């Protein structure tokens, strides 16, 4: 039997570190068998390693391509339906017509008939184009003419309408004469007033319509409309909406008090994403006003289209397009004449050079209208007499094309209007048109409802439609074949996600009245107030909360702090009220209540709890469906409750978004003792006033236990762990890490002879710790300072600049001391004394909440002071004496937004008794105990995998402890014992973290077994009394000293030093827990192992990479046909289209590589030659290869194939000199070219690791020790440099770069310490690795070393892997290996 052991895991988004430890903290090693054809049969390996992999990605790219394919397929089908109707009649006139149209884009040699697509002869073709320069000329002619037209022309006009049929946003009847701008503007105003609680109105809306239709610039339109509303400012939010509506860009940053720019532009392709981002900051409540503004913008745009002088025409759109064509023609002639007079050179650049943004590039589609206007404006501004052109450019009405972005505002009804005119006129001459009129119209108007979804049959992952009968679906039989009601139900089930806490329950809509009520009470429950004669802040009681909801939340959409103050004063007579837990206004609201009240107009009905189910069902329907017909159908069941007018108004309402919680969680599950639901507690929780998170984690209530029980995996799911992980909340990246970690644990158990581990310790990386928003915020420091100091009335930013700086910018403000200096207006935060800006390094940065309790290094927890001792006690917040003196100043900083409410609260906490023992215990405990839901899910998966037996009470019998640990504990352990981590050196740090997790967790639980309820997943009733037994003060002492068991001595704040025993023991059992010499020596020894199992996960590629972003089978954009004799390899746009004639797609993405042993014919004499070589298999070719591998390779020119070995991306090769390479890809179009990565890991001794740790942090001005250490050990850089150079010589092979580096290093003594550090390890705060770019695993990269540019090493070739190379297949841990000596292949 194997000895007892534990497993440590460090799970990230692109790595999993792992380690096996024994009871004495050692990492065992095992002699592992090696399979394959090499002489190596066994290798001794340490049970310590890391699995690296490419991060999981979202399905967005795949989804976008899939929807585009469907759109094009359906468009093609519409054309085929029309051809089917025309086919019999057309055959009697011209039986090759459709064939010629299909061949129209083919080169002349490939056409099956005449090269003239419409009439088949030059004379008629020319006459057609002379009479009808654009398709719109033809459409207008046919719509207005009473003459019999050629059937081919009728088809062309109808096909154009069916192909580009317009949007379906407007329901019901619509024509060009009822495009009501005034009504749309009133709708926008109503919504704006409701959301922003204003009362804007416009008496003369006709005036507004005249302004938007006038031929003036967009800016002038906005200004004129704004003047119709005298109370509105040019800088206000209404003005920004007007900018949007007239077609300009708006910025809502100031309006919503955001840190970053929030630009929106209706005509931008990214508008939907930009709006989604903005709503993410400000809330979905505002989505309606943007929706109404967009509708108004579309109406204005459409009115601009349809402004024609010919009132008799039945083709208003075509008339507008003809007008645009004529204006373009006339303006082009004027522009050509004008520019010709400037110079011939300018004329040629504008009209002949398509590489510029001039007319040649614009008309050829290589530059867009916006860039063309910018180019032209700049050119024309230099010359006189260009006012006509410049005015039209300002109106965006110059040289417009027929097809532009604003065509998207045309509804399908406009095309239908013209279609009906043509059919009515021509049906007199072609009876089949009269007979099929409804069918033809149906082709244009038919749209598959989104709730029916894709119509695929069989095992499609993306289709859910339910059929009544099994036959081909057409626009005319859709209603008979598809069961719309059942499909809608399937859509609901598919659309609604599951509760994070109760995985079997569906979440509520975001606008559910229950969900909104929950959010309101959850926010209210943490509001506190203080008034005159009150000693401390107190929470609102149950009656007060109910009153506020009834009187304010149900009376207005946005409730503010003033409302609460007004209530407390009016009802309770309080004066001098101050609030906490709310900034100006509540985030939550009962917006749905107000919507329904406006529609139903029955407050009693809404307030009656017995109607809750009806209201929730209505909101659910309005969230799920957009289709008015389906909404009406589903609301029809309430006809006996509401009258028709109410149901009609309801059917027009639409909600978006889903909450995160279910009705059952909020108001379903009940506490076993009290019988209360979570909502009940939020409304009335006595004096506790716990919020949602506190309620579900409170051991005194049964919610926590019920949630845990609900999360247990069913037996039917346990077999398919991949599906279970897939269903977890979280990103694809973190899920991939979880899945790999479970595979690693399975393999380690196998390696350990099948014996289960004593414990598994899990630490999980936080995702996106450095988000774009975070980066942006750090870069916005200057802007925020300028704004806040201006508010304070301070000129310090301009007047006080450090002597060593010429100006203050965002870079300079990354220095926390300088930033704090300005945030504090140059004052000591505790004394108010002036600080000297040129002596900032002499001052202390003090942590408001001491680091002993909270490791918070954010600006919110830091102040700059002349001496930290001025705060008062070192184990508490600043003293009451300091608060009394400085509170007024701090309040000024708060009002100017130089400090946050949280910072102010912590600074003034002494007024409320300072840090209580409960506060301190809570701070410390939160840093020790992992609370993230995703980590709990992983712990649950492992717990149910290994502890699946039950006792007689149906409780899990836990033989394997699943321990979750926060990274702060290991970070503290590393810091205390100088076990430095430097990520740039190699990938070992993931394995080391996993090992240290296991060590720290094991030692702590041996010493303090009563900590199991804190760290071990599951139910531990025997220790539950531990929490109640210890007082808060005892907890503080216990938690803050928890890591002291590893230290020999502890230094106290008062200067005393307490010695601890050399060997820590468990006080109850006497068992030895931690020997501070031998056990620490063991840890140092393990971290110094040069042999760590590093595996890069090999994977078949399902997508390529395009500038670092996932792409499809090849580059998305078509490339033009290659020049004659070009070697460029393209994939045809269609299988039957030769890319040499028609162009195609470049950048073919590879899936994997095969190693082929066989023969090929070489040279002109076709000499048979034996080969062993790589052949890339593209994602495109993969299906054909899998169908018949041998035949596929024979077609590639191979003969007598003896052997095929498939090699996924990152397959590992070891050369005879010990250097390792990973095969990233071989081009499928040229097997002599490919990408080979470095595969060795450099190992450094601890003295070099320590040097580099300090070197990476040399710019840290708070801790000068980093610089001092590097200055004292500068000589070690020389030794390190030559060690790295030797590694390069032996394993990397970049010998030319080695010489370049050697030459650059000769002058190293002349370089500053900062240059040396950034050259060796990369600049502080950067992801660049400096000199370690040369040695690190993966693709080569260029870098700079001591001022010399070192180019990317590109000399690895595919053939280099075939000389004396051994192919190494590794298992997920790297412990199992199969080695194949390529030289011995074929020896049987």
UniProtKB/Swiss-Prot annotation:
**Amino-acid positions noted as binding Mg(2+) 2 in the UniProt annotation, renumbered to this chain:** 10, 767, 990
Q: What class of enzyme is it?
A: hydrolase
- Here the segments flagged for biased composition (Basic and acidic residues) are 1100-1109
User: Per its UniProt record, what InterPro entries does this chain match?
Assistant: Cas9, Cas9-BH, Cas9_PI, Cas9_REC, Cas9_RuvC, HNH_CAS9, HNH_nuc, RNaseH_sf
Annotated EC: 3.1.-.-
All residue ranges annotated as the HNH Cas9-type domain in the record: 771-928
Q: What Pfam families does UniProt report for this protein, alphabetically?
A: Cas9-BH, Cas9_PI, Cas9_REC, Cas9_RuvC, HNH_4
Compositional bias (Polar residues): 1116-1129
Q: Where is this region: PAM-interacting domain (PI)?
A: 1102-1388
> Which terms does the record give in the GO molecular function aspect?
DNA binding; endonuclease activity; metal ion binding; RNA binding
Its GO biological process annotations read: defense response to virus; maintenance of CRISPR repeat elements
Recount the biotech application: Coexpression of Cas9 and both gRNAs in human cells has shown it is possible to use this system to target and modify a DNA sequence of interest in situ.
Annotated active site residues, numbered on this chain, are 10, 847
Which superkingdom is the protein from? Bacteria
- Record's comment describing the protein's domains: Has 2 endonuclease domains. The discontinuous RuvC-like domain cleaves the target DNA noncomplementary to crRNA while the HNH nuclease domain cleaves the target DNA complementary to crRNA.
The entry sums up its family as follows: Belongs to the CRISPR-associated protein Cas9 family. Subtype II-A subfamily.
Please name the NCBIfam families in this protein's record.
Answer: cas_Csn1
Return the protein name: CRISPR-associated endonuclease Cas9 2
Species source reads Streptococcus thermophilus (strain ATCC BAA-491 / LMD-9)
